[in-house]
Amino acid sequence: MAKLTKRMRVIREKVDATKQYDINEAIALLKELATAKFNESVDVAVNLGIDARKSDQNVRGATVLPHGTGRSVRVAVFTQGPNAEAAKAAGAELVGMEDLADQIKKGEMNFDVVIASPDAMRVVGQLGQVLGPRGLMPNPKVGTVTPNVAEAVKNAKAGQVRYRNDKNGIIHTTIGKVDFDADKLKENLEALLVALKKAKPSQAKGVYIKKVSISTTMGAGVAVDQAGLSASAN
């Protein structure tokens, strides 16, 4: 049996795995236990009452968190003409068509998000094997294929998170950094849960949001009591 590190022993002593914590208590606990030498992300896992084996019950989308994620995001946009100028004005680092595709084919991928206008998908389609495995392929379901590329760039820069359930029906994403004020982390979590509720498949039956847990990059998960969240989020 592997020996527990001092850090993990402390976490096990502090976190009751059988308890659901009030959101404020949960955030305070994460902050107390975040002893890594970098500013850890605060991540969330949401267990959904869906059958992930059925395509009509899968949940996928994007939402802009009110206080962002604390990450700086580099954006690449496939578009042309007036849209190209609008994308640059909105803050996109890379804008182009075939020239941008050629850069990517050479392995030059210094970006975190890819956005495309519909007319550019003929070019982006050639990059599916490169962008797809990295989760970067533009998709209208998450707002990254859109005629309004400038708005999409602004959303990405403002702290938009994309979400998609895994094979176990769990959503994993980030809601900020551990140095965020507790209120900001709480409001970001509530905004995410509101978005997930709006994305509930009509075929999903029973309890939809079954469990919510938050953790830091290097920490253990802390289960959150949804009763302590705003009415619209629980």
UniProtKB/Swiss-Prot annotation:
Single GO MF annotation: structural constituent of ribosome
Record Gene3D superfamilies: 3.30.190.20, 3.40.50.790
One Gene Ontology CC term in the entry: cytosolic large ribosomal subunit
InterPro entries: Ribosom_uL1_bac-type, Ribosomal_uL1, Ribosomal_uL1-like, Ribosomal_uL1/biogenesis, Ribosomal_uL1_3-a/b-sand, Ribosomal_uL1_CS
Keywords associated with the record: Repressor, Ribonucleoprotein, Ribosomal protein, RNA-binding, rRNA-binding, Translation regulation, tRNA-binding
Function, as annotated: Binds directly to 23S rRNA. The L1 stalk is quite mobile in the ribosome, and is involved in E site tRNA release.
Assembly mode: Part of the 50S ribosomal subunit.
Official protein name in the record: Large ribosomal subunit protein uL1
Protein's organism: Salmonella typhimurium (strain LT2 / SGSC1412 / ATCC 700720)
